[in-house]
Amino acid sequence: ARHLKPGIDWLFPYYRDRALCLALGVTPFEMFLASVGAKDDPANGGRQMPSHWGHPRLNMPSQSSCVGTHCLHAVGCAEAGVLYGRLPQIEGRDGLYQPDEIVYISIGEGGTSEGRAGRVRGVARAGVQAVKP
């Protein structure tokens, strides 16, 4: 978390990343709001299960419940960043793209067994760094 820049980098954590989300700026109160399905939950307004992290201010899109689907969203986000960097004529890009942004994604062992994770490795044109604990 120390090397990530919330609000600049794009963050796609999975449900076990509570400590990471706290370190990046999700507050304990916001986590509480998510756990009780409160309409003031910044991730999804109480429409998602707890621990489906998301926060607009931190560039952390809301996640789906299906295991591994956020892998595809993360690669799409990374490819959009590559296009924004290559095509300065894209309108409305201010605030959406930073030249040094990265896209962070984490998945668990179960997620690596899903076909979506394999497809991500196969289609990603942006650099992909896989780290195993």
Label each region the model flagged.
Residues 1-132:
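Cofactor-binding active-site loop characterized by glycine-rich and histidine/acidic residues
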